[in-house]
Amino acid sequence: MMRDSPSIQGTLDAATQHALLAGRHADPFSVLGPHQAGAHTVVRVLAPGARTVMAVLPGGQRTPLLPMQPGLFENTVPGLQPGAPAAYRLCIEWEGGIQHTADPYAFGPVLDAAQLDHCAAGGWRYLAGLLGAHAASVDGCAGTRFALWAPNARRVAVVGDFNGWDGRRHAMRLRYPAGVWELFLPDVGPGARYKFQVLGADGHTVLKADPLARQAEAPPATASIVPDERPFAWTDKAWMEQRAARQRCDAPISIYEVHAGSWFDDAGAPRWQNLAARLPEYARSLGFTHIELLPVMAHPFGGSWGYQPLGLFAPAAAHGAPADFAHFVDRCHEAGLGVILDWVPAHFPDDAHGLARLDGTPLYEHADPREGRHPDWNTLIYNYGRREVRTFLIASAIHWLRHYHVDGLRVDAVASMLYRDYSRPAGQWIPNRHGRRENLEAIDFLRELNAAVGVQCPGAITVAEESTAWPGVTAPVANGGLGFDYKWNMGWMHDTLRYMRRDPIHRRHHHHDLSFGMVYAYAERFVLPLSHDEVVHGKGSLLGKMPGERAAQLAQLRLYYAFMWAHPGKKLLFMGGEFGQQGEWNHDAMLQWSLLDDPAHRGLQRLVADLNHVYATLPELHCRDADPSGFAWIVGDDADNSVLAFARVDASHCLVAVCNFTPVPRPGYRFGVPHAGDWRVRVDTGATRYGGAGGGPPICLRSEPIPAHGHPQSLVLDLPGFTALYLRHSE
């Protein structure tokens, strides 16, 4: 809107002209656009490289603006009255043609002051709707509004395809005290590439991608993209209404973890579109309930697998457009599958176009490297003590859950957030205000995050990757916990894989590695993870961890999966594990699908499908996952034979799992059972349908009134080597 500038009489002093043309003027609205000069209205336009500029009134009257210096134009415009922001348009002659546009400096502030205040106070959860690039219509003029939080910057301009990436042309307005820079650019629409040119507090000018960009270029390009804001046509209303019940602790949850870039190679086609056509049906056919994706957020380095993201609001462009990702989620829901995303609020890379020193100061990160530099990954650590940073991160989480209908977030590297001395030697970390190692600000952030998700995204879940014994990770915030819904059981995973790697002849000496997990199984609500981390960096594949020849390896992997699926806790399996990938995972190559030409690998895949089916349909295997009454040891101390037997129960059903972790058959093996009567074999991992040799027990066994293991009834059977059996009581 035009404003009175009594000190300006139709010309600018030399210092102001120089600052404008040098790209150093911090308050462009004070000099550009329409201004009152006595009884007249003066219009000034900064258009370096333009040949001529005219102001055109609605009636067609044209007034040429005269160059004060090359690129800086000014004139009195007869007939132009105050108070009408879009009362004229500009006709600019460039070397390559004529441009007709409204003057961005003829418009008043475009961001709502109350929303800015709310945002500054940390209460704005939909930050992606306020900052970044948004289609807008101002006073009947269509365009894009840009906004960036950079409170310490001396000047900010938006640059892009629309202005030849010339940082002089579109300097932004500072909305004080929020520290937000804004500008409405007429005629800029979806697909336009842009960045922010920031003159920082340190005096350096840098180009930064938009932290709130909802679309970005594919690496190695680094620009942000004005998104297409047409709403996606979701078809998942029924799923969204049911998902809370599908994700409760008494529901069966079996997660298929996927790296979108290497699950299948579709010869250059848009990856989300092709994944949507293949992956949901595949995961559904194997009985999984959820797909968990390694981070899909925009990230500059593919070798990070997405765990060093810079675009916390934008899907990675390498896999397709944002609408393609929404389509993928919609197809998953159509197939009855939830979608969980890995999400990384623990750290970010220091790429020059990213968040690092965004306004010439350590804005998102800590200034002191003892707090702000991660020693393991050489990345920067978010300053959780800063209200605006917490708001930014929580807004990212809410954005994925609401805008993309995602059903849960697996929060990466929580342990590194909780401890100030994580991976740091003495003297290289700063204690908290109590002189201790706990990161109090990170604790508060995680609690605030989980509380916000619970309020803003009903039915969505959060899962912590937390590898220590921090108490109360899944306890409610009101009870002093962190408020997560689930926690990865890293201890169970490490103990049991260590056991399975051992030569079977030595396993008797390490029996506790299998049983110890039940000591703390109900301390949290757990997910049992066989994740991507266990099949990289020289660790080999899951199949390769099993000792012996190939047939023995497959038999042991079948046994291990059956043990896992019967054990309390939700399940997670990384892609390729379902059919026994032989090689270590390579993010640059697709899975070894050709292995499914081998009946033994097809058998393993069939077992995973059957385990998921049994797990989902037998309530005793899932409904008391968080209740100690749902589990009872029967044989927990037979280390000499490396045999375990335990019961999973609910109010009406009982299933007993018996596992032999050596190749030695145990003929006439007797174990107690809680009930008299018939017990039917529901799973036999040695069956020929799974690639085993067969020869297991009959399909139905009847208990005998012979006491064993504290029970008045018992079963006796010939227990094959490297075999797990599920026996269910027949009511």
Curated annotation (Swiss-Prot):
EC numbers, comma separated: 2.4.1.18
Q: What class of enzyme is it?
A: transferase
GO terms of molecular function? 1,4-alpha-glucan branching enzyme activity; cation binding; hydrolase activity, hydrolyzing O-glycosyl compounds
Query: Might you name a Gene Ontology BP term for this protein?
Result: glycogen biosynthetic process
Does the keyword section mention Transferase?
A: yes
Which reactions is this enzyme annotated as catalysing? Transfers a segment of a (1->4)-alpha-D-glucan chain to a primary hydroxy group in a similar glucan chain
In terms of InterPro entries, this protein maps to: A-amylase/branching_C, Branching_enzy, GlgB, GlgB_N, GlgB_N_E_set_prok, Glyco_hydro_13_cat_dom, Glyco_hydro_13_N, Glyco_hydro_b
One GO cellular component, as annotated = cytosol
Write out the pathway annotation from the protein's UniProt entry. Answer: Glycan biosynthesis; glycogen biosynthesis
* Pfam families assigned: Alpha-amylase, Alpha-amylase_C, CBM_48, GlgB_N
Arranged from A to Z, the UniProt key words for this protein are:
Carbohydrate metabolism, Glycogen biosynthesis, Glycogen metabolism, Glycosyltransferase, Transferase
Task: Write out the catalytic residues in the record.
Answer: D412 (nucleophile), E465 (proton donor)
Function of the molecule? Catalyzes the formation of the alpha-1,6-glucosidic linkages in glycogen by scission of a 1,4-alpha-linked oligosaccharide from growing alpha-1,4-glucan chains and the subsequent attachment of the oligosaccharide to the alpha-1,6 position.
This protein's assembly is summarised as: Monomer.
The UniProt entry's sequence similarity note says: Belongs to the glycosyl hydrolase 13 family. GlgB subfamily.
From the Swiss-Prot or TrEMBL record, give the protein name.
1,4-alpha-glucan branching enzyme GlgB
Source organism phylogeny: Bacteria, Pseudomonadati, Pseudomonadota, Betaproteobacteria, Burkholderiales
Q: What gene name is given for the protein in this entry?
A: glgB
